[in-house]
A protein has these predicted regions:
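Short hydrophobic alpha-helical runs that function as membrane-insertion/retention elements
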Residues: 21, 39-41, 61-67, 71
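Short, glycine-/Ser/Thr-/acidic-enriched flexible segments
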Residues: 27, 45-46, 70
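Core beta-strand elements of the Rossmann-like FAD/NAD(P) dinucleotide-binding domain
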Residues: 31-33
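Extracellular/luminal Protease-associated
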Residues: 35-47
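Active-site helix-to-loop segments that bind/position phosphate- or nucleotide-bearing substrates
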Residues: 2-4, 10-11, 58, 63, ...
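A short acidic, amphipathic alpha-helical/loop segment
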Residues: 51-55
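N-terminal, Lys/Arg-enriched amphipathic/low-complexity engagement segments
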Residues: 1-28
């Protein structure tokens, strides 16, 4: 099982024999790169060796650095990590529009299903669980209406988990925790996308010219309930 390494106190990060070397005052901690899913650095004064950054890129391990407010602000991503890079990106550019609609519908269906399963796992309202199942089925029946079904389902879902007064994107502790978790998840997904030879800016449904992670933001939808679950506890 791979772990997310959270750095808050360490003075320096380096590498030794394919192991992350954490230097903290007089202590040395070593962790095999094979056991690392991602590294989050919250100490802005931590020194990170260039050779470590190269090895992390080679192993598709995102390095996420937070600002002074502890918000994930920067993450590393490998540039050329696939032997058929040009072929994959050309395929991605030419993805069929109808196929993308079908894929997006499948993503939303799975997202709502995962939300429903989490509500059920947390023993939330049976009525809300049933309503999300209805919206999931509606997505299957009407591909073009998936975004509307997602919006309704998400409103019910979030208020069921975090309370009737909860509103997404407001400036509060729960939203800050959700945003933090989503940013970490987004960085991990982006590294996996690049490892497969695709480009994270070329999305399935997201297509903003100002967003470098459109495809990451498509794929993350299915996995958001993982973060929601962690924040709930």
């Amino acid at each position: 099982m791979q772990n997310i390494i959270h750095i808050t106190q360490s003075n320096e990060l380096s590498i030794s024999n394919n192991q992350l070397l954490i230097l903290e005052d007089e202590r040395e901690i070593k962790i095999s790169l094979n056991d690392i899913l991602a590294i989050i650095v919250e100490n802005c004064h931590c020194r990170i060796s260039a050779i470590l950054q190269l090895r992390l890129a080679e192993n598709n391990i995102p390095l996420i650095i937070c600002n002074e407010k502890h918000q994930p602000t920067l993450h590393s991503i490998a540039l050329y990590n696939h032997f058929h890079l040009t072929v994959r990106i050309n395929e991605q550019i030419n993805w069929n529009i109808n196929k993308k609609k079908e894929l997006w519908s499948k993503i939303i269906e799975n997202k709502i299903n995962n939300q429903r399963n989490l509500l059920k796992h947390l023993s939330k309202s049976e009525l809300s669980v049933a309503r999300l199942e209805t919206y999931r089925k509606n997505v299957l029946e009407n591909v073009d209406g998936s975004d509307q079904q997602e919006a309704i389902a998400s409103r019910i879902y979030f208020q069921e988990i975090y309370g009737d007064k909860f509103k997404r994107f407001e400036d509060d502790g729960v939203n800050s925790a959700l945003n933090y978790g989503y940013m970490v998840l987004r960085a991990i997904i982006s590294s996996k996308i690049v490892a497969k030879g695709f480009h994270p800016s070329l999305g399935i449904n997201h297509h903003s010219q100002f967003n470098s992670y459109n495809l990451s933001d498509d794929i993350i939808e299915v996995f958001r309930p993982i973060v929601d679950y962690v924040v709930y506890y």
